[in-house]
Every structure is written in C-alpha cells, then in structure tokens.
Amino acid sequence: MSKKLTFQEIILTLQQFWNDQGCMLMQAYDNEKGAGTMSPYTFLRAIGPEPWNAAYVEPSRRPADGRYGENPNRLYQHHQFQVVMKPSPSNIQELYLESLEKLGINPLEHDIRFVEDNWENPSTGSAGLGWEVWLDGMEITQFTYFQQVGGLATGPVTAEVTYGLERLASYIQEVDSIYDIEWADGVKYGEIFIQPEYEHSKYSFEISDQEMLLENFDKFEKEAGRALEEGLVHPAYDYVLKCSHTFNLLDARGAVSVTERAGYIARIRNLARVVAKTFVAERKRLGYPLLDEETRVKLLAEDAE
C-alpha cells in the first residue's frame, strides 16, 4: 500500500499542479482574515479587467468556531488552499478533478458531487454562483464564480477554488480527528496546533477586552478612511481586514447585539466598497499593466471617450 500524503505534501502537490496551470504561487497575506477570499490576492484582483491567476495557502481565523482544541473537526484557525483564475478557464472543473487525482483521489472511484451553494460575504459586498464539492459525503471544497466583489460587478468572470486542507487531509489519511493528521513525517497536527487552539479559544471567549476591541474597531475604521483620502488602497484594505477580525472577536465574545451586528457589518462593507472602487481607479491610472498591449490600448481608449 502506498504511503499516504502528509499535510505538507498535500500542499506541495497542489502548488505544483496549479503552478503547471499557470498560477503564480503567492504567500499567505500577513493580516488576520476569516477566509482566503479576503486576501488582497483575491478580493482586489478579482475586480477590474486585468487577468490574474494565483494560488496560495491561507491560514483563516474564525474566533467563534474555536472549541478549545476539544472538537475533532472544528477550529479557531484552519488552512485553506486558495486558487483564483481570471478569466475563468472553461475547463476549471475538469482541472479541479485532475488536481484530486494528483492527490490520489480517483474521481471514477469516489462519489464526488457539486452541490449548489451560492456564496455571499455581506461584510465585503461580495457574492457569486457557487457549489460545495462533496467527496463521499464530506465537503472538501468551495467552488465560486464571482459576480460581485466590493459591490462592483466582476468582468471578466473570476473562478475561485477553495480547498479545506484539514478536511482533505483527514480524508486522505483516514483519520477521525484533525489533530491526528500527520503534518510531516512523525509530526502530528495536534502537536503543533492544539495548544494555540486552546489559548485562542480561551482568549476569544473569556479573556479579550471588549472595551479595547470596540475602541480598536473605531480607530481602524477611521485610519482606513484616512488612508483612502490619500488614495492609499493597500494600507486602507489592511485596516478593513483589521476591522473584520476585530468584529469577529467581538462577535465571539457576545459583545454585539443582533442590531449592532448588522451595523458593524455595514461599516466594514462600506469601507470595502470604497477600497474596491479606489483600486480599480488606481489600476486604470497605472494603465492596466497586466493586460496585453492590444487590449490595454483599446480599453484605455474606450475609457478616455
């Protein structure tokens, strides 16, 4: 029997596969975020006319999902492998199935289903047509064609493939608990992450200073606005991410009511929309450098009319 892939070998296999499909291999973005979609490598690059093909691992923090390291399938922080391709290849689903084969999962021998699950992220004004991918009854991937990002219609269409690495690894390695996943030869997932899981859960649910978090949200929101006034898209978006994570900590702590929750989400969404519009304007001002010359000249001429 062949040796099962370790967690890091799964990552390496996916990186090599999507590299071969023309994706740039980006690194995880250094701000807390709830999903790989919120990385600027997806959120910003999915809008505007320029092509963009990228793949990266993104640690994703969801404070409300923390379970003190006691739940075998639910985590404060999990890892996503994010693929974003714009314009979307016509054979993106076939490429995805081929990537599973590279991981030793033969689609002809397993029950693989694309279950309709249209996606929406209210806090960033983003939505798209989507499917959950179920492997023998377990969700392992989210598949999305973005229709709107930051309140802006997307065009060309961007395809996003988000692998849940822990779920995928637990299936491949045939373990019931995420903490039993072999990260590398002789090193278990739990030996690396179970203590951080406990500590972050304790902090999120019991220890975090609610007043400080409320003040920080206001400060981060204000600073994002100041950066936008200067046309500084990327620093502004960093503060949008900080607002989002701070809100998630407040939400986990039970510090916001249902009414207040909607208000905080709207504040984040309003900032994200301004960031998106400013980014598109910035790329136009720069002359859409990632476009081929013929398309670039044509588009700039149309914009000038």
From Swiss-Prot:
InterPro entries according to UniProt: aa-tRNA-synth_II/BPL/LPL, Gly-tRNA-synth_heterodimer, Gly-tRNA_ligase_asu
Top EC group: ligase
Protein EC: 6.1.1.14
Single GO molecular function: ATP binding
GO cellular component, one term: cytosol
One biological process term in Gene Ontology: glycyl-tRNA aminoacylation
Catalytic activity: tRNA(Gly) + glycine + ATP = glycyl-tRNA(Gly) + AMP + diphosphate
Location of this chain's protein in the cell: Cytoplasm
Keyword line: Aminoacyl-tRNA synthetase, ATP-binding, Cytoplasm, Ligase, Nucleotide-binding, Protein biosynthesis
Keyword Cell inner membrane tagged: no
Quaternary structure and interacting proteins, as annotated: Tetramer of two alpha and two beta subunits.
Stated family: Belongs to the class-II aminoacyl-tRNA synthetase family.
Protein name: Glycine--tRNA ligase alpha subunit
Naturally occurring in which organism (per UniProt): Streptococcus pneumoniae serotype 2 (strain D39 / NCTC 7466)
Gene: glyQ
